[in-house]
Amino acid sequence: MRSDAIKKGHLKAPNRSLLRACGLKDEDFDKPFIGVANSYIDIIPGHYFLNDYAKIIKDEIRKNGCVPFEFNTIGIDDGIAMGHEGMLYSLPSREIIANSIETVMNAHQLDALICIPNCDKITPGMLMGALRVNVPTIFVSGGPMASGVTKKGEKISLSSVFEAVGAYEAKKISEEEFKDIECSACPSGGSCSGMFTANSMNTLCEAMGIALEGNGTILALSKEREELLRKAARRICEIALDERFKIRNIITQKAVRNAMIVDMAMGGSSNTVLHMLAISREAGVALDIKDLNFISSKVAHIAKIAPSLNSVYMDDIHKAGGVSAVMAEISSRQGHILELDALTITGESLEERLKNAKIKDENIIRKVDNAYSKVGGLAILFGNLAEQGCVIKTAGIIGERKFKGKAVCFNSQDEAIKGIIKGKVQKGNVCVIRYEGPKGGPGMQEMLSPTSLLMGMGLGADVALITDGRFSGATRGLSIGHISPEAAEGGLIGLLKDGDEIEIDVDAYTIHANLSEKEITQRKKEFVLPQKEVPSRWLRMYQKLVSNASKGAVLDME
């Protein structure tokens, strides 16, 4: 056992003495030691109950002949960190989470790992850390919350509250309606109820085979979710010493491809591109941002979920057959594009896992021949504005897929929010928010507040927004993020001026500023990088090491 390094032989008597202080007995030193990586924190609705979930898991591990050791990572709620300097810390927290998993698991030489993530950066951070450790690993998330319901009987989610801010600013809803939306949107614990970043990543864990069926869709705080926890705990005990189930044997090139196929079919958050690039790097497998359009061109978009379709939420997907039903439909109808021989954590191939899966409600999960779109729900655009690519959630587009407009430029998200409220962005404009990339922010803030303001003010179908920052999974509209190279590293987005004409063609995968090479060259000569004070030592360190979004915004020592 790997854990023999801390428990076997007379030289390890001091180690055992310390372990005995934690309650271990002689017989425990012959059992596998399993790390239980929790992410319990009171301030996140998807995490405040995870201490109870960890107890269920630890009890089941003990019943099955292993010794659990719980430890915790940090967690940030992007919704609570939104709209102030706290959002600068969201993406960097992914690196802290990954580092903490690696540090604890390797410092104590634990044999296997079960991770309990749920929201935002916690799932990708845990995946990255687990891949560095490379022991048998299983993921079981806390689960999504139920959708909210207003007094009028309308189903809503957190994105509805963000959009209500814009509607209230524009005097389109009353104060009473505004308060009702605020108080109704998040009715219970769990990750936010739509296909936002948390649920997208927990769904992709299922698609990659590192989590059991239902991981992405079974509601939090349900008996069914508790049974999933027990199943996961039993399974980690079964495979704790089996090298076939080391995480790098599960998250392979095939698994990463399967994840991106499911992402396209379900219209996942644009953040998944950022995270999967980082995860694939830790797994040692190739994923180039340029490959994603090819995958998208081969995969129909068959499940549209809030915020793209406000009548469908994660619990609806679960009742309609779940992620497995989506994968089974794609597999049977689209030329076996899925890698069906990929190994899953149960020991089954993906093909075996899907053999009994079927769509139970075709109004929720559509057949391929009745798909929302013949291509996937994400796209990568290229052009002189994004030579290394940028990302758009095509599933969330509500207006035209071709757009030409005059730039209205802002050098920060805060500046953009103030400008939008003052009416500086009008119908037909392209709202440009720059110096918000991984280096420029630093930290690559989410632009949910500006996009939600535009949507709530009735401009969502008539304005494009482009940024070197990123978007919440709750964003919809013609919102293009992750522009690389970013403004802070000399990208063309930093050279734009108010009134410059920008052309976007989603179906042609292009984004272009109509500027001559002569004009661009002249602007580069005149360009002076704006200086931004970064008081945080951690963020300054992050700024120096982080790559741009086209590489996953990873800390790069090379």
Swiss-Prot record:
Gene3D superfamilies attached to this UniProt entry: IlvD/EDD C-terminal domain-like
GO molecular function terms listed in the Swiss-Prot or TrEMBL record: 2 iron, 2 sulfur cluster binding; dihydroxy-acid dehydratase activity; magnesium ion binding
Catalysed reactions, as listed in the record: (2R)-2,3-dihydroxy-3-methylbutanoate = 3-methyl-2-oxobutanoate + H2O; (2R,3R)-2,3-dihydroxy-3-methylpentanoate = (S)-3-methyl-2-oxopentanoate + H2O
Cofactor: [2Fe-2S] cluster; Mg(2+)
Gene Ontology BP annotations: isoleucine biosynthetic process; L-valine biosynthetic process
GO CC annotation: cytosol
SUPFAM superfamilies per record: IlvD/EDD N-terminal domain-like (SSF143975), LeuD/IlvD-like (SSF52016)
Enzyme class: lyase
Keyword Transcription found: no
Disulfide feature: none
Keywords (A to Z) from UniProt: 2Fe-2S, Amino-acid biosynthesis, Branched-chain amino acid biosynthesis, Iron, Iron-sulfur, Lyase, Magnesium, Metal-binding
Pathway as given in its UniProt record: Amino-acid biosynthesis; L-isoleucine biosynthesis; L-isoleucine from 2-oxobutanoate: step 3/4; Amino-acid biosynthesis; L-valine biosynthesis; L-valine from pyruvate: step 3/4
PROSITE patterns reported for this sequence: ILVD_EDD_1, ILVD_EDD_2
Residues annotated as binding Mg(2+): D78, D120, K121, E446
Active site per UniProt: S472
InterPro entries on file: Dihydro-acid_dehy_C, DihydroxyA_deHydtase, DiOHA_6PGluconate_deHydtase_CS, ILV_EDD_C, ILV_EDD_N, IlvD/EDD_N
UniProt record similarity statement: Belongs to the IlvD/Edd family.
Assembly description: Homodimer.
Protein name, UniProt field: Dihydroxy-acid dehydratase
Organism from which the protein derives: Campylobacter jejuni subsp. doylei (strain ATCC BAA-1458 / RM4099 / 269.97)
High-level lineage: Bacteria, Pseudomonadati, Campylobacterota, Epsilonproteobacteria, Campylobacterales
Gene: ilvD
